[in-house]
Amino acid sequence: MIGIIINGAILGAIFSLIAVGLNLQYGVTRILNIAHGEFLMLGSYITYIFFTLYGVNPLVSLVISGPIVFILGLLIQIVVFRKLVHVSRSAEELESRSLLACFGLTFIIQNVVAEIFRGTPIISAPYLNVSTDILGEPVPLNMIVAAVMSVIISLVMYLVLRFTSIGLAMRATVEEPAGAQLVGINIFKIHAVSFGIGALLAALAGSMLVMIYSNITPYIGPQYTFIALAVIILGGMGSFIGSLVGGFCIGYVYYISLEIDPLITLAVVYSFLIILLIIRPKGFFGR
């Protein structure tokens, strides 16, 4: 039981961080980025490259993988999604076009990385491969570090959204786009920055994952996109707190099902999600 509580919480912390990025992108831009997991995969590979080739501590590599993927996300929003906003005549048209664009991005990023690495799975960075006892349960230290860092990053993001000018501009853009423009907020710039930050958060989560999981491949992205979608739907679309609560709920469901049979993990997660949505269609914190 202690093992379930600890390991479920560790997974929940990482899942929450992944979902916070996706929820931010959707909340501000109204684009559901189903290529979100590819940014996580890129963060994993960047961390792995710097660790194996240059001996860079995976925690230090956060300041490398994050900015690189932030810039990539920023450019993708400006070059792809901003153009789609301008040429789409309705919200429904933008939704369908952006969905197709996200599918395209998924395959492009996957295939570029697969071509570079020849599709060979990477083995997790051998970082802090020792265990410590928590309430009599041995827990790998790298998993604890990954979980704690995920929580810290999520809390920092919350503080940024609540108490900084960029956070205020993001919230104004979400709540009243026309009013935000009237007071001088460049909502297109806010869209780009928000999308970039969402990609950055996914990359940081990917850096955490490569510390604790082996067999990272160019094709892991969709799995974590589906997990992030489950988290934000459960917590409530557009709700930051919902992402945190939903992340821990899905983390426990995921870990328990993983212990029972790894082949049914995602099926169990989505079955759990469907049952809860029947009871509460808008999620825990949906409005």
Regions found by a protein language model. Name each.
Residues 138-216, 240-246:
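Helix-loop-helix "hairpin" substructures at the membrane interface of multi-pass membrane proteins
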Residues 85-113, 221-233, 262-278:
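Pore- or pathway-lining transmembrane helices of multi-pass membrane proteins that form conduits
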Residues 175-178, 182, 186-189, 261-287:
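Cytosolic-side transmembrane-helix boundaries in multi-pass membrane proteins
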Residues 2-53, 82, 88-92, 236-237:
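Single transmembrane alpha-helix segments in multi-pass membrane proteins
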Residues 55-105, 245-250, 280-281:
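Alpha-helical transmembrane segments within multi-pass membrane transporters and channels
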Residues 1-7, 160-165, 194-232, 254-263:
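Inter-helical junctions in multi-pass inner-membrane proteins, predominant
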Residues 84, 93-163, 190, 256, ...:
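Transmembrane helix-bundle core of multi-pass membrane transporters
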Residues 1-18, 46, 58-61, 88-97, ...:
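Membrane-interfacial amphipathic/re-entrant helices at transmembrane-helix boundaries
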